[in-house]
Amino acid sequence: MVQVAVMGAGSWGTTVAKVFADSGNPVTLWARRDEVADDVNDNHRNSAYLGDVDLPEGLSATTDPAAALHGAEIVVLGVPSQTLRSNLSSWREHIEPNATIISLAKGIEYETGMRMSQVIADVAGVGSDRVAVLTGPNLAKEVAQGQPAATLIACEDDERARFVQSAVAAPYFRPYTSQDVLGAEVAGTSKNVIALAAGIAAGCGFGANTNATVITRGLAETTRLALQLGADARTMAGLAGMGDLVATCTSPLSRNRSFGQRLGEGAGLEAAAEATKGQVAEGVVSCRSVQALARKAGVEMPITDAVVQVCYEDASPKEIINQLLGRTRKPE
């Protein structure tokens, strides 16, 4: 058994907390709101984010960060990428000296160009080998329901990766390990942008052929960027790359795809957020960061560029898709 703290009681944070608890570990979930913590403790549910999914007895909740982090050997950060730095700044003094810190956030800081694992190491003042990334084709609702799924635990320190792997392995949840943190994070961040493009195409009324084209060419541009930055090509073909991309680009449970679909139907950013319970999709936040990273690396990412144009430059979704098809022909 391993003491686990999960910081963030949204749908994915709560789901990951459930998986760790189902694996036999005592888990404390930090929630921002009293009513969420009370629901978890009194009713063994997080009705606000996971509906009627029953949570295990080994999972408790608190609104006190220090209490959640006390004694935790594994600290899971489940807050959005855009708030990770500020939240972690107030939590770092409570993190145990040798705890393994796991990032669930998929994003790149626009101001710094840093990946989330880099932000964590910087803010927490820890070595990069203490930071792991959990990523893969993991739609929260399906995992919370106990549907079979696999994930990737990426960490520079293979021993830590295997430690987390052992702690999070549940009957329905199979974790694999990797030391390619960079590749896992680039894939996870970029797939949110590609999923927006897939949703935009669906909102324009295009079908399976278009979706498959977006997925395939999206993987191609993601791979170009990742390899240029030094990632392992195998990561792009695995759970963090192709696996996560397919799930996010095809499922109606995907926030990014749903958000993109509203954009494709003609909604603006604010109106599109209604499709995702008022939350702006991570891909909207990340697309400019990915674009900036690609330009700095000298990598062409036309689908990412198209998403930026739709989200921030008032470009017509249909015109942008036609422009993509009209690009200079070349070998695959």
Swiss-Prot record:
Top EC class for this record: oxidoreductase
NADP keyword on record: yes
Subcellular location: Cytoplasm
The protein, known as: Glycerol-3-phosphate dehydrogenase [NAD(P)+]
Keyword hit for Flavoprotein: no
Active site (catalytic residues): K191
Family: Belongs to the NAD-dependent glycerol-3-phosphate dehydrogenase family.
